[in-house]
Design a protein with these regions (language model features):
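Short acidic/histidine-rich motifs immediately flanking catalytic phosphotransfer sites
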Residues: 77-80
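AAA+ P-loop ATPase motor domain of ring mechanoenzymes
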Residues: 1-63, 69-72, 103-493
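Conserved phosphotransfer microenvironments
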Residues: 89-99
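Walker B catalytic carboxylates
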Residues: 83-84, 338
Length: 493
């Protein structure tokens, strides 16, 4: 690409054909576009002057002065203007006017970086798309960067595995993370720092963690990152639901092998994303299950409240979703879309433009979930409110039911950490409390604080007080049947 741009400018200079065309570099990764621009300018023996479009004067007189000064400097110092328009707001008419004037009046060499094609300028513009690197290109970048990393490790070069194992490790990184060349370099640099401080250093783990960190900045601004230390042991579910979650995990881990190595993607490129629905009442473990998957897969988990993404303005919901998915793709994070009911209502007859656009919003979300190179999860408290036509496009649908007495007893047994002091807890009696796991965890935590404040181990009386507080918060009545025998001395065996 850099060679093509350089040849284009060279041909224009050789022909003395007047004002050179503006070069547009369109794509998601600003640093890759900057790298290309710098290579072009080096080949063309020009220096680069970078400028954010937001630094442009908005006053007409100031802008005219800026243009005159730039024209003089670009000629005297043989400079190319590299204009960063990646975060240009198309609705900012004042800035758009200044930008248009600059591009039309400056006669020298200009390169624009942008996410979407720039239009409406009365001057020739040639667009070059800068997509994210293909997996093979990413693999080459990884190999080159790891070779540099090995040189930096000095006496720790033994941390770099043999060629065959290293190739497998890098293929795993390429399959999970869609990083640009510059992000791969940064990940390797960060991994060196980790390896020098770890007591049991592992190059694979250091690179994996660095990749997760590289992808966070953009997504942290758009969604809530949930930290999770949960494991399969923290889940109490019926066997069928447990098996479904394990299948989801397998689909994420083996995605590259099945689609690329085994060739299933060649049959059909559609629907390669892993889209799931977790349905069930509040507190039944939907978010907890997502946390378990994230921890087991060593991936970040981001929670997005769909109610806050949906906009009353036509087209804005899709833009909000686009920003989230675009930011998430490089890191392969697990996306948890909460409150699916707010957008996935049953499809009704299209009577007006609002109905039509509402269906478009749903279709757009499903399309992005299906093409997302990772796991995207929807949650709902009421599956019956969702249109079956939409559900058919999801790969997994898992029901999270209210736990029965046996499952509640298991939850009570696991809810207290091994280091928490307890005394005389009757788990079968506690299981009489007809409440979901989320509320059980709240009660256990509150009981621990009550016991700690009293200087005692957690006992049934503390759990009773915590239960009364929890039920009052929920506006529920605590029946005598549910707490029967809780504070009877005969319970303490």
């Amino acid at each position: 690409m850099a060679n093509n741009i350089q040849a284009l400018w060279q041909r224009q200079r050789d022909l003395s054909s007047g004002i050179p065309p503006i070069i547009q570099l369109c794509g998601p990764e600003i640093e890759d576009k900057i790298d290309i621009a710098q290579v072009v300018c080096h080949q063309f023996e020009r220096r680069v002057s970078s400028l954010s479009c937001h630094r442009l004067p908005l006053n007409a007189e100031d802008l005219a002065t800026f243009i005159r000064r730039w024209e003089r400097e670009s000629i005297l110092e043989q400079r190319v203007l590299l204009l960063n328009c990646d975060d240009l707001d198309p609705t900012d008419q004042l800035l758009q006017t200044s930008l248009n004037q600059l591009l039309e009046e400056v006669k020298g060499l200009i390169i624009i970086t942008c996410r979407t094609p720039f239009q409406g300028i009365r001057r020739q513009m040639i667009r070059f798309d800068v997509p994210k690197p293909h997996p093979q290109e990413q693999m080459m970048s990884w190999e080159a960067s790891v070779a540099e990393l090995k040189a930096q490790l000095n006496g720790q070069r033994n941390l770099v595995p043999e060629a065959e194992q290293l190739s497998q490790d890098l293929q795993g990184l390429t399959a999970q993370f869609q990083l640009s060349t510059s992000m791969i370099r940064r990940a390797c640099t960060a991994a060196v720092g980790q390896l020098k401080t770890q007591s049991e250093p592992s190059l694979k783990q250091a690179l994996w963690q660095s990749c997760r960190v590289q992808a966070r900045p953009g997504l942290d601004e758009l969604a809530e990152r949930l930290e999770s230390k949960l494991s399969w042991d923290d889940l109490v579910l019926p066997p069928l639901q447990q098996e479904t979650l394990e299948s989801i995990s397998a689909h994420v881990r083996q995605r590259a092998k099945v689609y690329e190595t085994w060739g299933f993607a060649a049959k059909n490129r559609r629907g390669l994303g892993i889209a799931a629905l977790f349905a069930g009442p509040s507190g039944t473990g939907k978010t907890l299950a997502a946390g378990v998957l994230a921890n087991e897969l060593q991936l970040d988990l981001y929670k997005i409240e769909l109610s806050s993404v949906v906009s009353k303005y036509i087209g804005e919901t899709e833009k909000n979703l686009q920003r989230i998915f675009d930011a998430a793709e490089s890191g392969g994070a697990i996306l948890l879309f909460d409150e699916a009911d707010s957008i996935f209502g049953k499809r009704s007859e299209v009577k007006d433009s609002k109905d039509r656009y509402a269906n478009l919003e749903v279709s757009y979300l499903l399309q992005r979930m299906e093409s997302y190179p990772g796991l995207a999860i929807l949650t709902t408290n009421l599956q019956s409110s969702l249109d079956p036509a939409f559900l058919r496009r999801l790969r997994f649908v898992t029901q999270f039911a209210l736990p029965d007495a046996a499952h509640r007893a298991q939850i009570w047994r696991r809810v207290f950490p091994p280091t928490a002091p307890t005394q005389g807890l009757a788990f079968e009696r506690l299981a009489q409390l007809n409440t979901p796991g989320g509320n059980i965890r709240n009660i256990a935590l509150n009981a621990a604080f009550i016991a700690a404040d009293a200087g005692e181990p957690v006992q049934m009386k503390h759990i009773l007080r915590a239960t009364q507080t929890e039920y009052e918060k929920l506006g529920k009545s605590l029946t005598s049947v549910e707490v029967s025998g809780w504070v009877d001395e005969k319970v303490f065996v």
